[in-house]
């Protein structure tokens, strides 16, 4: 499992594409930026944003 890390901007979007794949994801900038850019998050946090 990847360690928690800060993901911002295009890095965050790229990570969502990798984690969610064909399911896609709903991009809620306020929630995910707060969770993954301002604080470190992990792959399980990212999966919460997949469709």
UniProtKB/Swiss-Prot annotation:
SMART domains: IlGF (SM00078). The keyword Cytoplasm does not apply. SUPFAM superfamilies: Insulin-like. PROSITE patterns: INSULIN. It comes from the Eukaryota. Gene3D superfamilies: Insulin-like (1.10.100.10). It is found in: Secreted. GO terms for biological process: glucose metabolic process. Pfam families: Insulin. One of its GO terms (cellular component) is extracellular space. Keywords: Carbohydrate metabolism, Disulfide bond, Glucose metabolism, Hormone, Secreted. Disulfide bonds join 8-37, 20-50, 36-41. GO terms for molecular function: hormone activity. InterPro entries: Insulin, Insulin-like, Insulin-like_sf, Insulin_CS, Insulin_family. The keyword Transport does not apply. Heterodimer of a B chain and an A chain linked by two disulfide bonds. Insulin decreases blood glucose concentration. It increases cell permeability to monosaccharides, amino acids and fatty acids. It accelerates glycolysis, the pentose phosphate cycle, and glycogen synthesis in liver. Belongs to the insulin family. This is Insulin. It comes from Lophius piscatorius (Allmouth goosefish). The gene is ins.
């Amino acid at each position: 499992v990847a360690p928690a890390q800060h993901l911002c901007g295009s890095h965050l979007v790229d990570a969502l594409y990798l984690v969610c794949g064909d399911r896609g994801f709903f991009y809620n900038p306020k929630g995910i930026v707060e969770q993954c850019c301002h604080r470190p998050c992990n792959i399980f946090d990212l999966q919460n944003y997949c469709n």
